[in-house]
Amino acid sequence: MDFDRELDEELEFTKSTKKVKIYPTFESMNLKPELLKGIYNYGFEAPSAIQSRAIMQIIRGRDTIAQAQSGTGKTATFSIGILSSIDTKSKDCQALVLSPTRELAQQIENVIEHLGDYMNVRSHACIGGTQVGEDVKKLQQGQHIISGTPGRVLDMIKRRNIMPRHVKMLVLDEADELLTKGFKEQIYEIYKTLPAGAQVVVVSATLTPEVLEMTNKFTSDPVKILVKRDDVTLKGIKQYYIQCEKEDWKFDTLCDLYDNLTITQAVIFCNTKAKVNWLAGQMRKSNFTVAAMHGDMKQEDRDSIMKEFRSGSTRVLISTDVWARGIDVQQVSLVINYDLPLDKENYVHRIGRSGRFGRKGTAINLLTSQDKDELKSLQHYYSTKIREVPADLSKIM
């Protein structure tokens, strides 16, 4: 992704953020040569807006609260910050990254592994749904960076398989989810085991005032890099709706879309596990090749589905919001909200899948007559315009 100065200046940051120095190239950050090589090898060419502002704040040891759009390189922002601070000569765990889902924790570990490819860095995804014995074995070998879910990481700390006394940095990714959905007590327990003065980095696509208030418990005089609310929705994503009137008419509408659009890969979001299973069954009956994923599935099944989807052997993934946060599949060009999300904050996480790293994407919302008010509410919440699908479907992709 090229650093687009003009596009970068279009992003509206809060007043306090405008005082933060911008580093327009990775070279200007004076990074380790091995890390710089890993960054370029991973495909980055220049920092995104959030990377150009936040990486150096993290490297300097400042507690940092960073908010940016999905797909703008938030994961790489803190990963580069972590890798800059790691002493690979030591076997100690020096950084913990906590995420709300297993898939996101694995994705982060994968990014860290690739960016640190030339650094001899050791990292491990410590997540629930896997054998405890596998974690113990890996942790005993010594891991510099651990990316995990709060429950499993806390369990490993209590078992003394993770020794947090040398941890320099704690990262809370998708902080709005972590701090509001039952993880708060686990995170605070983990935080209390860390050395005094450990750096805390808080990252999310959306940060409500309530979540920002909660971060006071974990941070000390943090630098805040926040975008204005009306810039949270991704630039470059075309947003449309189709008025289906009745729930029963949505499926036929979906089939019509697939008959008329050329789609690389797509994600279809439903609000319940039951509907995911039902819709997958209906599409298979209509000879569509689809995969389905939700939180009730075994971890190995979810891993297998994600592997197939990333490789491109499956072109359509039907999912609940378990997939909405942070899972990066570069080829996704279309997101369809079969149901509007129950939580407005999830809208940006869902549609962000279709425009990764500046590529153009399309989001289509299927509406019943009862969804009209919710659509207006979404548009007001994000200060965005969601247009009706034009008669000529070739114009929307």
Swiss-Prot record:
Domain (Helicase C-terminal) ranges: 236-397
Top enzyme category: hydrolase
Binding site for ATP: A68, Q69, S70, G71, T72, G73, K74, T75
Reaction(s) the record says it catalyses: ATP + H2O = ADP + phosphate + H(+)
GO biological process, one term: maturation of SSU-rRNA from tricistronic rRNA transcript (SSU-rRNA, 5.8S rRNA, LSU-rRNA)
The organism's place on the tree of life at top rank: Eukaryota
Domain-level remarks: The Q motif is unique to and characteristic of the DEAD box family of RNA helicases and controls ATP binding and hydrolysis.
Name of the protein described by the UniProt record: ATP-dependent RNA helicase FAL1
Originating organism: Meyerozyma guilliermondii (strain ATCC 6260 / CBS 566 / DSM 6381 / JCM 1539 / NBRC 10279 / NRRL Y-324)
Gene: FAL1
